[in-house]
Amino acid sequence: PPTQTEKPSTDKDTSIDEKPSIEQKPNIEQKPSVDEKPSEEIKPSPENNSNLGEVNDKFMTQVENLIYEKVNEERTKAGLETLSYNTTMEKYARIKSQDMGDNNYFSHEDLSGNLITTQMKNDGVTYRAWGENIAYIGGVSDANALAEQFMTNWMNSQGHRENILSSKFSSIGVGVYKIGNKVYATQEF
């Protein structure tokens, strides 16, 4: 699959896809509902092992929030309107990240050759334009460092940067999934 791998040090593994997905649907009404996403700062710690699943979920939500904030920082720097947070797109971003992690692949197409838009359409989700950025990072466990590395990688890749800074999109959902020492991130526009 088309991937670009950067290894800033021997203990980190990062990868972004070379060709972000963009699909236009000019005759479809609007994007799914939009909700604001609250900010939360929680990191996993050894004393919380009894609730590790819950702590991990909160940690990943923190990374999602930070990525969302960084997307809007980049859009503001570029003189663009900020994106609203879309919980419907968040659902599909989380599904995509978890599917890649659980099934050990890295591609816009799942193991059956389908984009996430196939599942969206099956669920009755409509949109005017759609875009997706995917990436994974290994060996990083700090929420801020993860969000920063994902955004740096995406902003240093022309197609991903174009998705983040596109005027075609008005909302975004972010999904992050951790399995082993890898963290997968998906942006659905």
Give the label of every model feature segment.
Residues 1, 6, 116-188:
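A well-ordered secondary-structure block
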Residues 1-105, 167-189:
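N-terminal targeting leaders of exported, membrane, and organelle-targeted proteins
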Residues 94-123:
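Conserved alpha-helical segments that form or flank metal/cofactor-binding pockets of metalloenzymes
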